[in-house]
Amino acid sequence: MLPINNNFSLPQNSFYNTISGTYADYFSAWDKWEKQALPGEERDEAVSRLKECLINNSDELRLDRLNLSSLPDNLPAQITLLNVSYNQLTNLPELPVTLKKLYSASNKLSELPVLPPALESLQVQHNELENLPALPDSLLTMNISYNEIVSLPSLPQALKNLRATRNFLTELPAFSEGNNPVVREYFFDRNQISHIPESILNLRNECSIHISDNPLSSHALQALQRLTSSPDYHGPRIYFSMSDGQQNTLHRPLADAVTAWFPENKQSDVSQIWHAFEHEEHANTFSAFLDRLSDTVSARNTSGFREQVAAWLEKLSASAELRQQSFAVAADATESCEDRVALTWNNLRKTLLVHQASEGLFDNDTGALLSLGREMFRLEILEDIARDKVRTLHFVDEIEVYLAFQTMLAEKLQLSTAVKEMRFYGVSGVTANDLRTAEAMVRSREENEFKDWFSLWGPWHAVLKRTEADRWAQAEEQKYEMLENEYPQRVADRLKASGLSGDADAEREAGAQVMRETEQLIYRQLTDEVLALRLSENGSQLHHS
């Protein structure tokens, strides 16, 4: 940090006197501005940086995080970067024409001045902007998220990245592409956009448009799905969600949301217990999640669903660790559609089972632990498949894709944690052929990879530490002996073979690979030994249908 010098002055000789005369107007105005500081403002530090920037002819001026309520009118004319983020600014002065990068995030700006003609980056997220001035043709990146903007001016042809999340936009700007080679990624999530202009199809297929959590009409969704599903479609990838963009952000007290899942004769006791958790992190969003969960198709149509949720909530009340994990998993669940709530419920049930396994529920039931591990493995593979499917779609709600594979294959793959119904399968883009291929891939990878995966699974290790302490200690000793005696040479050999000796990044990667291979070998041997003993005793089988 530059030293604070309220009385910044120059040496008294003829050369510096000439310079001082040139800067006199700047210095005088800045000193006057400093004297008008409000309590808490660090204008003395700001003036020190201003003078240092001017004298050194620096092209960067950083006045961020100084609690400034205003800036002086005359900024150094030569700067190309200005950072005034995290202050209390309500407006900006006239900007130097040389400016290329403007950072003014997290202020209280209600408007912007005329933007310099050479500006390339505009970062003004988290302000109170209601509109924007004309955007210069040179602009490459812009972040205007978390403002109050209703409409956008024309977008420059050069603009590559635009983030306009959480505004009040009611429509998208017109898109004109032609032969422009620019690859664009634009974010318009969480606005009030109800329709999509046909000009969006002018964008190249390498471009991405994000419009999740907007009140898109069913007509707009159907039209876009029809267009983007065409074999000759060459437009951008469009990310949307089956949300009306108007989820209720209000929530009732946590205890009230929880007790609603219990029979009346238990509600008083349950309420008293859960009142103690109302100030825990994510408690408010967890309350909202519970209310949204009650309105899913599974809650309405699945017998015993309410009792299942109540039993789960009882387990949460008894374990601070499990409750913390579950609150975090549910944190963003209500920001999208009903199916996101359903997918979150799947994840919460996984969290519960893995927690129970780690805590010892299956210590004496290896067959049940294997079944749980097999289900977790299958879900991991389905996530990989869903991720690959998302990349092939031009009009995609990622939540629907992930949930579709779990829901539609829940019975065939014996997924106890997956809901059996979803609301918007029709827009997922997942076909019957996708499901057949996914099932075959899961079974093939399970046959070839599950034993290795299970041998490295955390809950299995927790069981081994508790129930096979001597064998676990021997395996750990063997691992550290191999790492001490063989690890350095194996890493060196791998780097030499790839011609990357001396490359620090390559060394870290090679080291991680050798470590994983070592653990895989030792833990697989231990797993085979323990499972052979336990499964022969109780008649369970490692292989499963």
UniProtKB/Swiss-Prot annotation:
Notes on how activity is controlled: Exists in an autoinhibited state in the absence of substrate protein, due to interactions of the leucine-rich repeats with NEL domain. Is activated upon binding to a substrate protein.
Q: Where is this region: E3 ubiquitin-protein ligase catalytic domain?
A: 251-545
Q: What is the enzyme's class at the highest EC level? A: transferase
Q: What Enzyme Commission number(s) does the record list for this chain?
A: 2.3.2.27
- The NEL domain is annotated at 253-545
Q: Among the record's GO biological process terms, what is one? A: symbiont-mediated suppression of host innate immune response
Q: Where is this region: Interaction with target proteins?
A: 1-242
Write down the SUPFAM superfamilies for this protein, in alphabetical order.
Answer: L domain-like
Q: Where in the cell is it found?
A: Secreted; Host cytoplasm; Host nucleus
Q: Where are the LRR repeats?
A: 57-77, 78-99, 100-117, 118-139, 140-157, 158-179, 182-203, 205-228
GO CC annotations? extracellular region; host cell cytosol; host cell nucleus
About its domains, the entry says:
The LRR (leucine-rich repeat) repeats are involved in substrate recognition with target proteins.
Report what the protein is called.
E3 ubiquitin-protein ligase ipaH9.8
Instruction: Name the lineage.
Output: Bacteria, Pseudomonadati, Pseudomonadota, Gammaproteobacteria, Enterobacterales
